[in-house]
A protein has these predicted regions:
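Intrinsically disordered, low-complexity regulatory regions
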Residues: 1-113
Length: 113
């Protein structure tokens, strides 16, 4: 006989499975951004192309150059990549079509000049 109470949690989200040490690294990216820009600046919206470019810079630094941490922020490059992926997911969930400037087969990327 168990002294533990009954809990019907089958099918519920398992937050306990997330690697918290890496979530903390992602939180450091958000914290750095809140100081460099302002809190919640990313929620104002960044174009998909700018997010993609930043994601690729961090991915390139980690993948091809073997760097682990960004020199400016001190944040792990993969945490920065995760930040931009979360931006994409948030903007898509929020229906921010105004930010979606992905190129298509018939329309090349636009210049940011």
């Amino acid at each position: 006989m168990s002294n533990e109470g009954e809990k019907f949690d089958t099918g519920k989200v398992r937050w306990d499975l997330l690697p918290m040490v890496w979530l903390e690294e992602v939180a450091k990216v958000y914290s750095f951004g809140s100081v460099k820009y302002e809190s919640w600046n990313w929620r104002k919206g960044l174009s998909f192309s700018r997010c993609a470019a930043a994601f690729m810079r961090h991915w390139f630094a980690w993948w091809w150059r073997g760097e682990t941490h960004d020199q400016e922020s001190g944040c792990h490059h993969l945490a920065s990549c995760t930040f931009y992926l979360l931006n994409f997911m948030t903007y898509q969930k929020d229906g921010r079509k105004d930010l979606d400037d992905r190129p298509t087969a018939t329309q090349p990327p636009q210049s940011r000049a």
